[in-house]
Amino acid sequence: LHKEYRRQRQMCIRDSSVTVLEAASHIGGRCVTDNSIFDIPFDLGGSWLHSADINPLARIAEQKNFKLHKKNWSNTWVHSNGVSLTSEQIREYVQYIEKMWQNINNSDASKKDLSVEKLLPKSKWKGIAKNQIALMLAADPEVSSALDVFHFTNSKGDWLVENGLGAFIKHLFNDIGVVTDCPATTIDYSSNGVKVETPEGIINSKYAVLTVSTGVLANEKIKFFPELPIRKKEAINNLPIGLLNKIGFEFDLSWQEAHQGQTADYLVGERDFCSIEFGFYDSNIAVGFVGGRFAEELEIDGLGSATNFCCDALKAIFGNKIVKFINKTTETAWKSNTNSYGSYSYALPGGFEAREILAETLNDRLFFAGEATMSNSQATVHGAFLSGIKVAEKILAIDTAN
């Protein structure tokens, strides 16, 4: 796949003039590394090489000798509604989570597309464990398609890239020019070629590849001429943009009570939930995660709300003294970001087939790519990468035929 990627890229660069428009002020969109917050780089968006065994980006990172952190993560602490679980209870909790995902992943694809919620096994651990789903899907289980999860091609390994995944992606494509702060506002594909209007002027092209989030499409930030077909609009509505926000903590180096691979889960009520992973990049950085409706509520409450909730988790587990060891914090607010309106897509129950519809080309010149168009690697950076290769192959085939 790496060789095929290089071949397709060389052909595109050799035979075509490519202009990349980026609405944000940085390269990478939802995959961006910030070097200004902590002493080490911090990924504000995508940070994982998921399913590393079969992830083409993981192979490229290995071939380019990037340092990779491959340690598995596991629960060391769980605090639920004022009670810290014992080691035996944590073992049962982890076993339930494994069974929960097995139930979803083993669901019969021929059956009606149910919500993830309806496939959760009964257990005393269901109440807390189901909150893990929003951290994976960026949406709560009752609004998420079980078939969408069923079709995801999962494999071993969730790796981190030293100095950030966003920085790695930027390095990978550093020879391709990108115009930042340049959102597309209108796309006219009514005649031969495509006309794209931006604040910087009009670009006329033979083909256009649209990689914006389903949040941008649903909010009609881009006007299309002709309008998108009803079939395409329905697909967009069946693939809402979900929300996963990250809360970063930089601890004083003297604090040594947690290390890489350890995770703490914290629940208040039924769904006020966060999970904190320690020792990112084998450093003094920890990252808290909040997802789904609860993440939206925290974001609406304002900057600092998610950080405060994760601080409550840290104090519940390690005691109030931990606060004095926190040097710096940061938190993301992807729902408020009008370049995405969220983190990544999820499918509504009954909406799994929308991914293939979203990926359909219009008039052999307007192409759709991005994680939301992938039926087996959705919601991932490598899914977005693979979607780009698929579209490049489509363009080359059409161009050759013409």
Question: Where are the regions a protein language model picked out?
Answer:
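Single conserved hydrophobic/aromatic residue that forms the stacking wall/gate
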Residues: 1-9, 13
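A short, Lys/Arg-enriched amphipathic alpha-helix followed by its capping loop at the start of a domain
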Residues: 10, 14-16, 175-176
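Glycine-rich FAD pyrophosphate-binding loop
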Residues: 14-37
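Conserved FAD-binding subdomain of flavin-dependent enzymes
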Residues: 39-73, 175
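Mobile amphipathic helical/loop "lid" adjacent to a hydrophobic cofactor/ligand pocket
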Residues: 51, 62-159, 213
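Conserved flavin/dinucleotide-binding core of flavoenzymes
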Residues: 142-150, 193-195, 204, 221, ...
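Helical element adjacent to the flavin cofactor pocket in flavoenzyme catalytic cores
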Residues: 146-207
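Central helical "cap/lid" subdomain
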Residues: 189, 201-259, 320
